[in-house]
Swiss-Prot record:
Name used for this protein in its record: 2-C-methyl-D-erythritol 2,4-cyclodiphosphate synthase
Catalytic reaction equation(s): 4-CDP-2-C-methyl-D-erythritol 2-phosphate = 2-C-methyl-D-erythritol 2,4-cyclic diphosphate + CMP
Gene: ispF
Cofactor needs: a divalent metal cation
Residues at which 4-CDP-2-C-methyl-D-erythritol 2-phosphate binds: 8-10, 34-35, 56-58, 61-65, 100-106, 132-135, 139, 142
Source organism of the structure: Pectobacterium atrosepticum (strain SCRI 1043 / ATCC BAA-672) (Erwinia carotovora subsp. atroseptica)
Entry's family note: Belongs to the IspF family.
Enzyme class: lyase
Cofactor note: Binds 1 divalent metal cation per subunit.
GO BP annotations listed: isopentenyl diphosphate biosynthetic process, methylerythritol 4-phosphate pathway; terpenoid biosynthetic process
Subunit relationships: Homotrimer.
Length: 165
């Protein structure tokens, strides 16, 4: 069993679409980023890569590489997941916390879970997404951006049993 933690944050800005968990959310601004700025998928990708000891999203998809400019984060997640599968892992479970004052995430969470389950080739019961605010404290509370944390549990595909390291 391997556990990974991921964190991502992006500042609001620009006129691009707001994409969170692979869902386009109507809002006045997008998030500033080299790719599409999807904080959920970036945090999830980092959690999974960390659990598999494959580095992080910046190592795999550097923001200095023009090939990833404006990249669809679902594609990045699927490529990371392919590499993790190649190491013999499957998802045990995934828990995601979105931290944002606005917009409200609750109406979009079911589709985020569907997207994550599709991309990670797992059952929706293995994926949890929730959202919270910071009660108007800090940069997310002031509406300056969105943050996300993710924790992923990986298990070996062959047996599905706990592996002690």
């Amino acid at each position: 069993m391997r556990i990974g933690h991921g964190f991502d944050v992006h500042k609001f800005g620009g006129e691009g679409p707001l994409v969170i968990g692979g869902v386009r959310i109507p809002y006045t601004q997008g998030l500033l980023a080299h790719s599409d700025g999807d904080v959920v998928l970036h945090a999830v990708t980092d959690a999974l890569l960390g659990a598999a000891a494959l580095g992080d999203i910046g190592k795999l998809f550097p923001d200095t590489d023009p090939a990833f400019k404006g990249a669809d984060s679902r594609g990045l997640l699927r490529e990371a997941w392919r590499r993790i599968n190649d190491k013999g892992y499957q998802l045990g479970n995934l828990d995601v916390t979105i931290i944002a004052q606005a917009p409200k995430m609750a109406p979009h969470i079911p589709q985020m879970r569907v997207n994550l389950a599709e991309d990670l080739q797992c059952h929706m019961d293995d994926v949890n997404v929730k959202a919270t605010t910071t009660e108007q404290l800090g940069f997310t509370g002031r509406g300056e951006g969105i943050a996300c944390e993710a924790v992923a549990l990986l298990v070996k595909k062959e047996t599905g049993e706990i592996v002690a390291w």
